[in-house]
């Protein structure tokens, strides 16, 4: 769960309560985005979504003013809007009655989510101060660690397949049991992608699942990346690792499929950008060709 504040208020007065009130458990660093101003809440929500890089349909808006709730429902119907009762003592029972925040298991990334999105804000600020994308990527000093999936990480891999919508080539959903089954299959290769940079560790934010069709051909079953690291050439780094591994194994070609959904437009031209050729249903990469690694990223395969 990512926390954000969208409040019509005087910033100095409101932030003082957050910082100094003795009964305020949540502090400034617990919120991934803060909009305390006199702007309309519709615009604030759009800015929050852009800042933390999530879709509007992933947002739940809580407000104790029925008018604000009605405005958001009309203007942004994809958002779940909850009109809070006037008595704060009813807040907790209301939230506990909702199924939307239920989770079967908490991963390490879940525990660090607030910190991760606080660091994301610092990246946005750096990007705004940098003249061009190439310079920004250099300043980030991004490192990508590719790890074989094991019992300690399979929960996160399953979670990514269940939740990732935007940069996801096939949008296949896998339970932990299914990931474990594939992990123990000698014909399958599953990689967990950990991303870190000068601002900190973003955790495992991507995964790929490869099936060895035969000695000459690999098929990309799943290739996805969390929205918070999209646009930093991490996806190209992931693909370069797959290409390098395939070449070492003597594979001749890699085939992949893009299955279009309402939400995965950001991934629609990725295979073409990587040099895959469209062969009808599948895209094919000829491994006799070179694949250019991103110059701004260091890669460690473990």
Predicted regions and their residues:
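Short, high-confidence coil segments that cap the C-terminus of an alpha-helix
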Residues: 54-56, 187-188, 248-251
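Active-site phosphate-binding/coordination module
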Residues: 24-28, 35-42, 49-52
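Flexible loop/turn segments at secondary-structure boundaries
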Residues: 8-15, 42-44, 66-70, 89-90, ...
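Short amphipathic alpha-helix that is part of the acyltransferase structural core
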Residues: 141-173
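Conserved Lys-Pro-Asp/Glu-containing loop-to-beta segment of HAD-superfamily phosphomonoesterases
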Residues: 45-66, 72
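Substrate-recognition element of Asp-dependent hydrolases with the DxDx(T/V) motif
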Residues: 1-22, 34-36, 153, 169-174, ...
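Acyl-donor binding region in acyl/amide transferases
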Residues: 195-198, 204-280
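Terminal substrate-recognition subdomain of acyl/acetyltransferases
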Residues: 51, 73-142, 244-302
């Amino acid at each position: 769960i990512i926390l954000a504040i969208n409040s019509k208020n005087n910033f100095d007065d409101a932030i003082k309560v957050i910082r100094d009130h003795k009964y305020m458990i949540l502090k400034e660093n617990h919120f991934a985005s803060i909009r305390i101003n006199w702007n309309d809440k519709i615009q604030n929500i759009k800015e929050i979504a852009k800042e933390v890089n999530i879709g509007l349909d992933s947002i739940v808006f809580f407000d104790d003013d029925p008018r604000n709730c009605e405005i958001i429902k009309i203007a942004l119907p994809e958002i779940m809007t909850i009109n809070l009762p006037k008595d704060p003592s009813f807040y907790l029972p209301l939230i506990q009655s909702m199924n939307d925040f239920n989770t079967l298991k908490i991963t390490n990334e879940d525990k660090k989510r607030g910190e991760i999105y606080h660091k994301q804000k610092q990246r946005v600020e750096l990007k705004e101060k940098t003249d061009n994308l190439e310079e920004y990527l250099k300043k980030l000093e991004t490192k990508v660690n590719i790890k074989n999936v094991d019992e300690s990480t399979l929960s996160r891999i399953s979670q990514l397949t269940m939740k990732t919508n935007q940069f996801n080539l096939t949008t296949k959903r896998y339970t932990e049991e299914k990931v474990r089954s594939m992990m123990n299959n000698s014909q399958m290769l599953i990689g967990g992608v950990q991303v870190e940079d000068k601002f900190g560790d973003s955790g495992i934010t991507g995964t790929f699942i490869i099936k060895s069709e035969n000695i000459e051909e690999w098929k990309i079953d799943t290739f996805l990346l969390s929205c918070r690291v999209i646009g930093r050439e991490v996806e190209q780094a992931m693909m370069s690792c797959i290409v390098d591994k395939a070449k070492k194994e003597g594979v001749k070609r890699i085939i992949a499929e893009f299955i279009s959904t309402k939400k995965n437009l950001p991934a629609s031209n990725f295979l073409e950008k990587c040099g895959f050729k469209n062969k009808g249903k599948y895209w094919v990469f000829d491994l006799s060709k070179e694949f250019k690694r991103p110059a701004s990223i260091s890669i460690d395969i473990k």
